Amino acid sequence: MRIRPTRRLLLGAVAPLALVPLVACGQASGSESGQQPGLGGCGTSAHGSADAHEKEFRALEKKFDAHPGVYAIDTRDGQEITHRADERFAYGSTFKALQAGAILAQVLRDGREVRRGAEADGMDKVVHYGQDAILPNSPVTEKHVADGMSLRELCDAVVAYSDNTAANLLFDQLGGRRGSTRVLKQLGDHTTSMDRYEQELGSAVPGDPRDTSTPRAFAEDLRAFAVEDGEKAALAPNDREQLNDWMSGSRTGDALIRAGVPKDWKVEDKSGQVKYGTRNDIAVVRPPGRAPIVVSVMSHGDTQDAEPHDELVAEAGLVVADGLK
C-alpha cells in the first residue's frame, strides 16, 4: 500500500509551515555523546528553532507512540532533514546492505588491488556450510546446504531476501566483528558497533550499544557504497551498480520508505525489524532526472513486545520526500 495523503491528513493537527532545511546535530558515537535511543538529539533549523519538519516528526512520535530517528541528505545540493539523527538505534537487518557492500569492497574485481586477503576468484568464491548453520528466515541458504553458495549468491540472498544464514556466513567472510568494523572505519564510520551474529543481534535492548548505529552514520555508509563516485567512492562503478541492483530487488521494504515517496521515484532499500518494536529502512531514493536522496529511518518502542510500525517509516519517508522535492 502506497502512502500519499496530504500532510494535514497525515499528521493531524500539524499546521503547514515554510520548509526550512535542518542542520545536522553533529555526528558522535554513543559513548561520546551519551545519548540513548529516544532521548534528545533532534534536528533544528538554521535559526536554532523547531521548524515544520521537526513538528511533523514529533507528531509521528505521538501518533505511533514510538521513537523515530531520521537522516536524509539530498546529494544534489547537500540539503539535510534530520530528527534524532545522532541517537543510537538497533539496526536489525538494515546492516545487510552494508555487509554486501563491504564484501564487494574486499574482493578482487576487474583486476583491482585486493584490500585484504580475498580469494582470487572474487565474487565467484563458493562458501560451504552445514545444516547446523541454517537459521530461521533463511529461504535461500536452506536450499543449498549440499552445494554451497558463491559470495555473489550470498549477497543477493542477504539483501533481497534478508537471509539470516547468509548474513552470518558473510560476517565470517569479513572477519567477524573486527573485520566488519574495520571496513566501516575505512568509510569514516566510527559510530556503528557491529558485534553479534544473527539472531542474537535482534535483542535491541534499550541502552545496549551492541549492534547499533545512528541514522546519520548508516546513511553516510550507504551513500559511500551505493552513490558516491570518484575519490569518495567505496566501490568501483560496476560493483556499485551491483549493490544497487540487489537493493532494487528487495521486496521486504515495500511498505516502508518506498510506500511514502511518489510512485515515479525509484527506491533501492534494505529494511530491518527486531524486538522493542524496532522498524528500520535505509534507502537510496532516485527522483526522476536528478541526483539521489539517501534516507535512513530507524524507530523503536518502549517495551520488548512493542509493535513495529511500517506506517511510521512510510510517513517519515513522505516528510522527507515533500521536504526535498
Swiss-Prot record:
Region spans: Disordered: 30-50
Its domain of life reads: Bacteria
Q: EC no.?
A: 3.5.2.6
Report the source organism: Streptomyces cacaoi
One GO biological process term is:
response to antibiotic
The remark listed among the other comments is: The class A beta-lactamase family has a specific amino-acid numbering system, sometimes called Ambler or ABL numbering and often misspelt as Amber. A multiple sequence alignment was used to derive a consensus sequence and then the consensus was numbered taking into account insertions and deletions. This allows use of identical numbers, e.g. for active site residues, despite differences in protein length. UniProt always uses natural numbering of residues, hence there appear to be differences in numbering between this entry and some papers.
* Signal peptide segment: 1-26
Recorded protein name is Beta-lactamase 1
Q: Which GO terms describe its molecular function?
A: beta-lactamase activity
Q: Where does substrate bind?
A: K270, S271, G272
One Pfam short name: Beta-lactamase2
What SUPFAM superfamilies is this protein classified in? beta-lactamase/transpeptidase-like
What InterPro entries does this protein's entry cite?
A: Beta-lactam/transpept-like, Beta-lactam_cat, Beta-lactam_class-A, Beta-lactam_class-A_AS
> Which keywords does this chain's UniProt record carry?
Antibiotic resistance, Hydrolase, Signal
Q: Which PANTHER family match?
A: BETA-LACTAMASE (PTHR35333), BETA-LACTAMASE-TYPE TRANSPEPTIDASE FOLD CONTAINING PROTEIN (PTHR35333:SF3)
Active site annotation, chain numbering: S93 (acyl-ester intermediate)
Catalysed reactions, as listed in the record: a beta-lactam + H2O = a substituted beta-amino acid
Which family does this protein fall into? Belongs to the class-A beta-lactamase family.
Question: Does the keyword section mention Signal?
Answer: yes
